Amino acid sequence: MGSQQAAVSFLSNLAKAAFGLGTAATVLNTSLFTVDGGERAVIFDRFRGVMDQTVGEGTHFLIPILQRPHIFDIRTKPHTFSSISGTKDLQMVNLTLRVLSRPEVSRLPYIFQTLGLEYDEKVLPSIGNEVLKAVVAQFNADQLLTERPHVSALVRESLITRAKDFNIVLDDVAITHLSYGVEFSRAVEQKQVAQQEAERSKFVVMKADQERRAAVIRAEGESEAAQLISDATAKAGMGLIELRRIEASREIASTLARSPNVAYLPGGQSMLFALNR
């Protein structure tokens, strides 16, 4: 009888000890939280609200039920968004912007209070569209291409300044895509065609001018040659002309002699006399 009571007492004490250990393990487990690399934690206290200090990497203690950690990723993350903006000459332009952002670590408690954990998704698209529309409105549509480095620099400076108002740090800002509306694209094509036609017309005019100059030079040369021949004739008489005529006749006779389909008939009536005999 005594042994049974001792066994029951032992089991009861063992159950109490196991329950105590389990409760202690649960409390200990809920009192610990881990912050991984590239993260920071903001502690919310039910009595004091959001704590001013952020918690760094590693395992830390908190008061169960009264305190709760909220983990922020502080590594640089890419974000891409598009905006349709109007230019100074009232053309619609579609731009795509890529930014690399991260939160300002010392301001994480304030970011959590005002924006929450998804601060970047709430802020960046809004201020990105705002800055793009403001900058694009300062340029004509064609200037966005010819002055693209200047446009990108203005967008970068304005967006970095605007993001600081929300305690967000931008490591890089870049315009990755730029396209125009259908009407402007058609106008650009027509302008290119017109420029090509103008260049072609300019070439035709230059060619005609060169041909005209060549004709003038050729006419002047022929005039000078005729004058020289006239002067030579006046000095030497008709002998020069007869010499040129003989040379031309010799060239013609030489050409005809080499042709197999040409027969030479001597002048006069001697051939006719030979036929009559």
Swiss-Prot record:
One of its GO terms (molecular function) is protein-containing complex binding. It is a single-pass type II membrane protein. Mostly expressed in proliferative tissues, including vasculature, shoot and root apical tissues. Expressed in roots, stems, leaves and flowers (at protein level). Changing G37D: In phb3-3; reduced sensitivity to salt stress and defective in H(2)O(2)-induced nitric oxide (NO) accumulation, light-induced NO in cotyledons, abscisic acid (ABA)-induced NO accumulation and stomatal closure, and in auxin-induced lateral root formation. The chain crosses the membrane at residues 7-28. Disulfide bonds: none annotated. InterPro entries: Band_7 (IPR001107), Band_7/SPFH_dom_sf (IPR036013), Prohibitin (IPR000163). It is found in: Cell membrane; Mitochondrion inner membrane; Nucleus; Cytoplasm. This is Prohibitin-3, mitochondrial. It comes from Arabidopsis thaliana. The lineage of its organism: Eukaryota, Viridiplantae, Streptophyta, Embryophyta, Tracheophyta. The gene is PHB3.
